[in-house]
Structures are given as structure tokens and as C-alpha cells.
């Protein structure tokens, strides 16, 4: 994000979690069990609330262009399927390095372990953790099925992505170019 703010790169796509460190209002998306389905979530992110959050980004050197679907975060693990609350008990679950995720997975009875994403595959492979939570598309693209036996569609947290452009880049565009983008 700092490269985007500085104008070193023009565009990026990030999870709202990264934006929550700059504006705590983005952490609303990480509250557990807020949305029943993608339709509800999309109505919020694409509606006035989501647009209001994007409107706060220019003061941080960013312009939020739109939200992209990333979906609900789900749990994979190497021990057992998760069908009920008790199934979380004792599982070491890798979570993203945002305090609310530690709180959520502690409350569920698991042992949350914050691990940076680039270290996740190795941590699962070496059994440093039993499982992890992320969106289905990430589970697929990161090949986590190679090191995880069970996928449970827990849908605890909805995780939209935000398409960002550097404000420096945005300001160099003509109004016609901005409309196209």
C-alpha cells in the first residue's frame, strides 16, 4: 500500500483487512456472522455504506475504485471436519495478523496462530498449525488442498477486496480518463 500511496505503483487489489489499519471502519467487514449470504454482503459494500468507506481513502493517498468479490472465509484443517462449534476445540488455526481474528477463533475454542500468508503453506506442511481460514479462491490458488484434508464451509467472515489506484496516478488522469477507469 505504501508503494501505491507514493505513486511507485498505479493499481493494486487488497483485502479490506489491510485498509483497516488505515481506517478502522473497514474492519466492520471482519465482524463474524454479519452477513447471511453474498447478496446481503454485496448490498452493503456496493451501497451507500461501502461507498462512504471508499470516499475516505483519498486522504490516505488512495482512490477506491470498486469492491471485488472474494467471498466468505472458510476453514481447512488436517484433523477433522468442522460441522459444529465443538469441532473447533483445540485446533491450531492460522489466522491473519489482525486482532479481531485472534478474538474470533479464540471464542470458537481453537488456538489461533497469526502467521503471515507467505509462510502459511510451509506452516501447514510442517504441521506447525492444524488448519487455516481464508476465501475459497485463495485455498485453491495457494494449493492448500495439498496439505489439508478437510474443507469446512464455515462462512464466519465475509472478505471483500478493494480495487485501488494511487491518488497521485488518479490526479494525473483527465476527467474523461477517470470515467473510463
Predicted regions and their residues:
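N-terminal secretory/targeting leader peptides
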Residues: 1-40, 49-180
